[in-house]
Amino acid sequence: MRIFNIVRDCSYPRYQPKSDQPIVTQFDTGIAFNFFLLENNQPCSLAGSKVFLSFKTDENEVLFTTECQVIQDLSLNPVTRITYISDERLTKRSGLVHGILDLVDSTGYRTAFPPFGLVIHPHLLDEPTSIDH
């Protein structure tokens, strides 16, 4: 299983590290995403909240939306982590896919974290590339 760790701070929506665009192939069906959520560089409290992860194509077509598991540990090493383990729905199409993490609190207020990109290469290339020659 491939594991990608992605950090998001809702106080700094423009900060997007370059490492946030994992590259996988359609063969990769066991992919785990760990999102570490912060607010002002501190773990944010998700008490009573639900977290949803949506994947969209470049054409803004929603591939699917799913609820994620929330792991919150505010003890010695404070961390708020959202975990999602993918299945074949994510890698059924090749191309650039955008992941959007939405937090919905107990009052229904929605917070969207900055999106991340995911490059999915096809199973087999239809045309020869320079590597093939």
Residue ranges and their predicted role:
Residues 129-133:
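Compositionally biased low-complexity segments at domain edges in trafficked proteins
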Residues 1-128:
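N-terminal assembly/attachment segments of tailed bacteriophage virion structural proteins
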